[in-house]
Amino acid sequence: ARCENFADSYRQPPISSSQT
């Protein structure tokens, strides 16, 4: 989970964790 991808981490599975 990064700066913007942190939202996807708690809302849904970290699918965008690879793409920052």
Swiss-Prot record:
Q: Which domain of life is it from?
A: Eukaryota
Keywords from the named record: Antimicrobial, Fungicide
Please verify whether the record's keywords include Repeat. no
Q: What is this protein called?
A: Cicerin
Renumbered to this chain, region (Disordered) spans 1-20
Q: What does this protein do?
A: Has antifungal activity against B.cinerea, F.oxysporum and M.arachidicola. Inhibits cell-free translation in rabbit reticulocyte lysate system.
One biological process term in Gene Ontology: defense response to fungus
Is the Nucleus keyword given for this protein? no
Name the source organism. Cicer arietinum (Chickpea)
